[in-house]
């Protein structure tokens, strides 16, 4: 049985390693994928099920990341081995709890933004775009750097105060 911490943290087995490190798994093909979708049937139980499933699968597959959510938006970053991230994204596209799935960023990286998190949950309290901004099309105008910057800011916030 696989046990995943309820807070979404993971261990360091999947963090990028340097070649030649004794006993470590080297992951040289780290893909970072960010997508946005609209929740279908958003409530606490649905969100809990999504997070539990994501943390279980991500721990198994060496994926880390974060899910920013509220009733009108899911914004998620996945990072890990290319094949595994691609498979996870394909599952998300097929998942009927997500509507209007749109890929915003898909790039190779050497370092993870969330190396310690199988799936960080952030309830989008204040730092994500407002509902009015979303309705006005902020995502259509946002650059990949803008979207990545949101997650880098979240990572800095979590690393500064992990209890927040």
Model-assigned labels for residue ranges:
Residues 2-8, 12-164:
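Charge-rich, low-complexity N-terminal segments
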